[in-house]
């Protein structure tokens, strides 16, 4: 049993909760997720099973797309709807569509962002949320992130009321805190704000419409069709360029054999396959020997090579 499961993460569960539940359903210990989603967030959560856990790091660096909602009028401790109210300032004027779109535009491109106190970012070996729960404030590291697209989804021309909400879609780099973006939008418009809803619609090439629920996974287990829920390792890595090696080279790859970059591939990672179209390893460019590739992650062992 191996591959990537595209889970439609439900609301109210942490990513670790999802891994724990999937271990029980599949009766498989080797399971890991490819990036944390907050409990209130739903949507695409790729989970690696069996040998696929070795490729998790190559699936976490992808861009992510979210659809969410910002609410102006009050901010919270967690920057989303689950936290306690920190500041209230009713929206006492009409907000125009142009104002919102201009705010989103200023947050598009390469920007700096400070992670929220209620996050898993570590400072001095301790997670920020641990400081927050103890009532301690610490200096947080500023991150550089990339916002590829930030668009308003509401079709209204004006927004008015004591608490204004509007929907958006954002495509961003790994490590972006979308709830912090919601706070930044409010700051641009002059009001406290928080993220009131969020769903991840894409993680790299993995899309929400291709995800399955826990109920569907359990149904496949009961029906004996569990293999159908997996994306193969080969398919999950299909975005990387591919090299094919002969049988003798395949046997040496498990021991860390270097390879010549005969195809002159410039991409940072290269997948290496045997003649049977089985992915053996992921290689990268050797930093000291131009034209050579070195293994970054070997996916097979002695026993598997003999199969």
From Swiss-Prot:
Catalytic activity entry: uridine(55) in tRNA = pseudouridine(55) in tRNA
Pfam families the UniProt entry points to: TruB_C_2 (PF16198), TruB_N (PF01509)
Coiled-coil regions, chain positions: none
Catalytic residues, chain numbering: 38 (nucleophile)
GO biological process per UniProt: mRNA pseudouridine synthesis; tRNA pseudouridine synthesis
CDD domains: PseudoU_synth_EcTruB
Keyword field contains tRNA processing: yes
tRNA processing among keywords: yes
Signal peptide region: none
Class of enzymatic activity (EC top level): isomerase
Keywords for this protein: Isomerase, tRNA processing
GO MF terms, alphabetically ordered: RNA binding; tRNA pseudouridine(55) synthase activity
UniProt-listed Enzyme Commission number(s): 5.4.99.25
Known function: Responsible for synthesis of pseudouridine from uracil-55 in the psi GC loop of transfer RNAs.
Family: Belongs to the pseudouridine synthase TruB family. Type 1 subfamily.
Record HAMAP family: TruB_bact
Identification of the protein by name: tRNA pseudouridine synthase B
Organism: Bacillus anthracis
